């Protein structure tokens, strides 16, 4: 019976009777995420693409391992003393402070207002980085070698969740079991968009067997630019809201950020062929004329001036479920 190997970066099934000392190619280290770069602590290769990170071939050979790594156990908090409910209640008067209501109360502008391109401010660090890239882009001969139809032995399959490598002509007839969706990491949970088997353990996520069968993809055929996720966050002051998108070497001539009083559309092209897109229905109202974008070598900052100096409960306006309930109540 074939068993699943739980070595990091492997995820293949193996026969215990034929398991040898060099049957498994895996990563003995741990995954490392730093400044939008992803890699393994045991090797030097880094990438910003999560799918490319998952397809990094292991750097160590050894035996397949069928033992599932233990998940991190949360510490159990126990108390030896039994206290009455009256003792557990706080001995002070509680004050519940509600978040400010959305700005719809002050006549929220229509989302159909015309969009305006925000001013782009390009930093000196980005200009220097782009100049260096232009000089290095002259060496296109190395890229031409990658465009050849010849597949090298040991090339890893580019399909998500597949860890098979090219061994020869027999690999062309082999069935590929892979994930047709994209990897998603949200609030500590990791899963594929195509099957949504969620887990908080990274090793378990890497070992998830694919949900789709097809042919291996030994070479990437990029039809132009591809949309990829980017790490981004936001913060606010009394008068401004700032969104930071961590995309390196963005191209100002191909990027744009447009907005009206309540909507924000972000389109960033970075690292030559990658795109990041985000459409945000803003929680509050902004002053478009006093808002701008700062582009640096490591990130893009979108600074939006608030129309009123008030705290936003969140960046995006939540779905209007309450409004739908109110409509149902009035019709009853």
Swiss-Prot record:
Residues with PTM Phosphoserine: 51
CHORD domain: residues covered: 5-64, 157-216
Lineage, uppermost ranks: Eukaryota, Metazoa, Chordata, Craniata, Vertebrata
Protein name (Swiss-Prot/TrEMBL): Cysteine and histidine-rich domain-containing protein 1
Residues reported in the UniProt entry to bind Zn(2+) 1: 5, 10, 24, 64
UniProt source species: Pongo abelii
Top-level taxon in the UniProt lineage: Eukaryota
Keyword Transmembrane helix among record annotations: no
UniProt domain CS: residue ranges: 227-316
UniProt subunit comment: Interacts with HSP90AA1, HSP90AB1, PPP5C, ROCK1 and ROCK2.
Keywords noted in UniProt: Acetylation, Chaperone, Metal-binding, Phosphoprotein, Repeat, Stress response, Zinc
Region (Interaction with PPP5C): 2-77
Pfam family, one: CHORD
Task of the protein: Regulates centrosome duplication, probably by inhibiting the kinase activity of ROCK2. Proposed to act as co-chaperone for HSP90. May play a role in the regulation of NOD1 via a HSP90 chaperone complex. In vitro, has intrinsic chaperone activity. This function may be achieved by inhibiting association of ROCK2 with NPM1. Plays a role in ensuring the localization of the tyrosine kinase receptor EGFR to the plasma membrane, and thus ensures the subsequent regulation of EGFR activity and EGF-induced actin cytoskeleton remodeling. Involved in stress response. Prevents tumorigenesis.
